[in-house]
UniProtKB/Swiss-Prot annotation:
This is Endoribonuclease YbeY. It comes from Haemophilus influenzae (strain ATCC 51907 / DSM 11121 / KW20 / Rd). Single strand-specific metallo-endoribonuclease involved in late-stage 70S ribosome quality control and in maturation of the 3' terminus of the 16S rRNA. InterPro entries: MetalPrtase_cat_dom_sf_prd, YbeY, YbeY_CS. The keyword Nuclease applies. Belongs to the endoribonuclease YbeY family. SUPFAM superfamilies: Metalloproteases ('zincins'), catalytic domain.
Amino acid sequence: MGSVLVDLQIATENIEGLPTEEQIVQWATGAVQPEGNEVEMTVRIVDEAESHELNLTYRGKDRPTNVLSFPFECPDEVELPLLGDLVICRQVVEREASEQEKPLMAHWAHMVVHGSLHLLGYDHIEDDEAEEMESLETQIMQGLGFDDPYLAEK
């Protein structure tokens, strides 16, 4: 199995309680499961203001969100190992973990896995797509040693 090279960007004032680069690489690799070659992605951890601005600009939603995924789009004839960018909002992840009574690192891992699957083309707009994506997220999270992230909803 190949590996995932992560360009980690910390753009939040409070770095206390953030996952390490090693953890993020482990979670992304578990989700992407690259075969052979190395693939690359950027993970940017931001505050609510940046998340809000990006969510409004790119999704038309006037609020911060937990994770935004920006897949790298490249012409078919060009082979680059770039998956794209994830933007994860520290405050939203912390708030959701608290509200859902989940361990904070488990929720961070889930956001990296969830966002990575979006970079691979998975989506959850339609019910059948959501079911497939959630099932895959559960398998990956359990493979990484975490509980089913959707257990409370079931």
